[in-house]
């Protein structure tokens, strides 16, 4: 069984060192062959040197790949094209894998009844969690907890397969296509939803996926992401991305108003009421008050993405 681990990276040489150290330290079970590819997405720091200095420690199982087209999706697609293992694993450059990560991958795919897997993201805080942090918006900082049971990824799963801790068979990727480059973060915008788009295609194809609570990665949360400004920007641009997806794949059995699901208006209205109540001192929980404001940013982003935003990036192969 051959696993290719892809790490798309952009100007994070210090965190990349920790990511690579965790992969090197993790136990590789018998029967699993691992190769790691760092995809440098136009970094201006010493990313290449970091990789080159660690090749000997990886005993020839570490590769450097440069991808000049900006965006995580483009970097991932380059990594997929440059590798050939029957499994494609993806982690981010601000993460560390658990010591048993490889073992969990091997166990899952040895059964032969699964096409993709994902797992939890345990936060490693770079600063104290602020009192206004809303637990309904943990996705902003990449905090994922799908519970302590193995469950199927399907229409009833309360989330999606996140692209910073997942493994997909290469055969499945051949069927559903690679990542759509019109979505995903770049150096200019906090666009998102490359994961939502891929997850939608995986489910539509009939691929079988499992959430594994012990397929763990540890995700660093820097202080600059624990600000209200970052939360507002993230929610707006994620809304833009969801609006773009909806423009192409309108949801079924959902009531719309002015091209936007009606429930978004309701959520924003209730949220703004809580925000005003908080400003007047009637809402004592700062997290609830701020969550109310973020619901309005969700709506604003979705409306803009659905009707106005054109990012000008190529569509990529995914889903076209």
Name every feature range the model reports, one short phrase each:
Residues 12-26:
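Short, well-formed alpha-helical segments that are part of the catalytic scaffolds
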Residues 22, 40-49, 95:
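A conserved acidic beta->alpha catalytic loop
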Residues 67-83:
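Glycine-rich, basic loop-to-helix element that forms the pyrophosphate-binding segment
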Residues 88:
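Short aromatic/hydrophobic "clamp" motif used to bind/position activated sugar donors
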Residues 100-133:
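Conserved donor NDP-sugar-binding/catalytic core segment of glycosyltransferases
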Residues 136-159:
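Short, flexible, basic/aromatic active-site loop/helix in glycosyltransferases
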Residues 161, 185-198:
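Acidic donor-binding loop at a coil-to-helix junction in glycosyltransferase catalytic cores
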Residues 233-237, 250-320:
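Non-catalytic, C-terminal membrane-associated alpha-helical segments of glycosyltransferases
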């Amino acid at each position: 069984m051959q696993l290719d681990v892809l790490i798309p990276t952009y100007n994070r040489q210090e965190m990349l060192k920790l990511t690579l150290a965790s992969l090197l330290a993790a136990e590789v079970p018998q029967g699993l062959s691992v190769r790691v590819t760092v995809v440098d997405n136009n970094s201006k720091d010493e990313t290449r040197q970091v990789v080159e200095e660690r090749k000997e420690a990886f005993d020839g199982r570490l590769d450097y790949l440069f991808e000049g087209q900006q965006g995580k999706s483009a970097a991932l697609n380059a990594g997929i094209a440059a590798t050939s293992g029957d499994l494609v694993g993806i982690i981010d450059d601000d993460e560390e894998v658990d010591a048993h990560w490889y073992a969990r991958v091997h166990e899952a795919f040895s059964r032969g009844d699964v096409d993709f897997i994902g797992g939890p993201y345990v936060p490693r805080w770079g600063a104290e969690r602020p009192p206004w942090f809303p637990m309904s918006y943990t996705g902003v900082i990449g905090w994922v907890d799908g519970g302590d049971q193995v469950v199927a990824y399907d229409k009833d799963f309360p989330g999606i397969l996140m692209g910073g801790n997942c493994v997909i068979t290469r055969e499945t990727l051949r069927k559903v296509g690679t990542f759509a480059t019109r979505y995903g973060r770049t150096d200019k915008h906090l666009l998102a939803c490359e994961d939502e788009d891929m997850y939608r295609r995986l489910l539509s194809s009939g691929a079988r996926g499992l959430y594994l609570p012990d397929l763990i990665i540890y995700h660093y949360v820097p202080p600059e992401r624990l600000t209200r400004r970052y939360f507002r920007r993230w929610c707006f641009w994620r809304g833009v991305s969801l609006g773009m997806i909806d423009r192409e794949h309108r949801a079924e059995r959902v009531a719309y108003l002015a091209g936007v699901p009606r429930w978004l208006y309701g959520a924003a209205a209730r949220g703004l009421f809580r925000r005003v109540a908080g400003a007047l001192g009637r809402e004592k929980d700062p997290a609830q008050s701020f969550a109310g404001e973020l619901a309005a940013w969700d709506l604003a982003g979705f409306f803009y993405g659905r009707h106005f935003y054109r990012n000008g990036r190529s569509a990529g192969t995914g889903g076209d």
